[in-house]
Amino acid sequence: MISGIRVNDNCVTEFNNMKIRKTCGWIIFVIQNCEIIIHSKGASTTLTELVQSIDKNNEIQCAYVVFDAVSKIHFFMYARESSNSRDRMTYASSKQAILKKIEGVNVLTSVIESAQDVADLK
């Protein structure tokens, strides 16, 4: 927790529910008031569709996303191209805090800025 940002316990609970009980297909985490919290979660979709929906939501500038791709759980930091560098640095320096709390991530991608980045992964 180098950045001073702590992970809300609900993040771990919901991640474990997604991983074990398959209660949702994805979770978006954001930093609010020096704490990582759940912004939203939803049913299964494709990774491209998920990132496209984040792209359309102007409320989200930066976030952490976990995505259950059936056989693997993906984790990535989302940072809109237009997001300010301070937010990007805060999210980058706090990433290890959440990764230490949520166990079972199989695929770790550094930063995704748009749906096009997901297409480039394939």
Swiss-Prot record:
Predominant location category: cytoplasm
Entry's Gene Ontology BP terms: actin cytoskeleton organization; actin filament depolymerization; cytoplasmic actin-based contraction involved in cell motility
GO annotation, cellular component aspect: actin cytoskeleton; cytoplasm
Keyword Cytoplasm belongs to the record: yes
Signal peptide: none
Matches recorded under InterPro entries: ADF-H, ADF-H/Gelsolin-like_dom_sf, ADF/Cofilin
Biological role stated in the UniProt entry: Not involved in actin polymerisation, instead functions to stimulate nucleotide exchange on monomeric actin and influence turnover of the small amount of cytosolic actin microfilaments. Essential for erythrocytic schizogony.
Protein name: Cofilin/actin-depolymerizing factor homolog 1
